UniProtKB/Swiss-Prot annotation:
It comes from Bifidobacterium adolescentis (strain ATCC 15703 / DSM 20083 / NCTC 11814 / E194a). This is Large ribosomal subunit protein uL11. The keyword Ribosomal protein applies. Keywords: Methylation, Ribonucleoprotein, Ribosomal protein, RNA-binding, rRNA-binding. PANTHER family: 60S RIBOSOMAL PROTEIN L12, LARGE RIBOSOMAL SUBUNIT PROTEIN UL11M. The keyword rRNA-binding applies. GO terms for cellular component: cytosolic large ribosomal subunit.
Length: 143
């Protein structure tokens, strides 16, 4: 068995799918750890070309020999909720100002998409997490 590589950094970034480029903020974040920025951009864009227009979180593991691996996550719940509710952004005051609404079916659909990244045991628990995110954004959940 080959010896394990030593990890030098773990970066968590949210990048627009298919639009990774060496410009800030991505370039400086990767460059400071010695990663080949263009190589990462090409690999990330190729991996996310089918998800254009979405923000895809990525976890980049940088090793001491300057090589890297990355894991793509599911889009943020807030982004999926904004898309489902048809709004540009959430509210500053979710208690008094509601900006949109989503149905329980839409919440279930989002929870099923996010299940891999949620710390929930089943879809019902995942729905509660997504509904809580919706409430904090000023989005009401209707039957």
């Amino acid at each position: 068995m080959a010896p394990k590589k030593k990890v030098s950094a773990l970066l968590k970034l949210q990048i627009q799918a298919g639009k990774a480029n060496p410009a800030p903020p991505l370039g400086p974040a990767l460059g400071s750890h010695g990663v080949n920025i263009m190589d990462f951009c090409k690999q990330y864009n190729a991996a996310t070309q089918d998800k254009m227009g979405q923000v895809i979180p990525v976890e980049i593991t940088v090793y001491e020999d300057r090589s890297f691996t990355f894991i793509l996550k599911t889009p943020p719940a807030a982004a999926l909720l904004k898309k489902a509710a048809g709004i540009q952004k959430g509210t500053e005051n979710p208690l008094t100002h509601k900006v949109g609404s989503v149905t329980k079916a839409q919440v279930r659909e989002i929870a099923e998409i996010k299940m891999a990244d949620l710390s929930a045991r089943d879809v019902e628990a995942g729905m509660k997490i997504i509904a809580g995110t919706a409430r904090s954004m000023g989005i009401t959940v209707t039957d």
